[in-house]
Amino acid sequence: MQRGARVQVIDPHGPAAGASGGIVGALAPHVPENWNPKKQFQLESLLMARSFWAEVEDMGGLSPGYARLGRIQPISDAAGLALAQARATSANSLWGDAARWHVRRSEPTEWTVPSPSGYEIFDTLSARIHPKQACLSLVAALQARGVPILTDGTDQGAIIHAT
């Protein structure tokens, strides 16, 4: 649509019918090592997600339940600690100032998992989203731009089947 395409959405079961009703922490980065084009593409996508979902919410007026909150991972032993520290150096090089992979002393709280080594990783790139809210937020944004959302219809023009 941003490039001028005419769009219609045909979903026989209705938008978000198959979406999970819970929050998902599935927006996490690949480990910052053995870098390749797929990992670079994923990094760029994760970095664009905040502005993308903010724009969707602004257009449609519904929250997608997106937030880039980071992720805490306990480190089990000395070998894991050495690997995490090497990855922190790699992340600094690959991610630049856009995100961080911190190795820090673990601070036990009511909601964290104990770390056997006393250290943990905190990355600032991981995010969470609410799948059903995200679908409904996209629908609201599309409808605000005049896109028909249908349960039945005929294919017209270029067809993209999405799952």
Question: What residue spans do the PLM features occupy?
Answer:
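Flavin (FAD/FMN) cofactor-binding and adjacent substrate-gating region
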Residues: 57-59, 63-145
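Conserved acidic E/D residue at the C-terminus of a beta-strand in Rossmann-like folds
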Residues: 9-13
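N-terminal Rossmann-like FAD-binding beta1-loop-alpha1 element of flavoenzymes
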Residues: 1-8
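A conserved short coil-to-beta-strand element within the FAD-binding core of flavoproteins
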Residues: 148-159
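Conserved FAD-binding subdomain of flavin-dependent enzymes
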Residues: 14-71, 81-91
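Short, well-ordered coil/turn residues at beta-beta hairpins
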Residues: 162-163
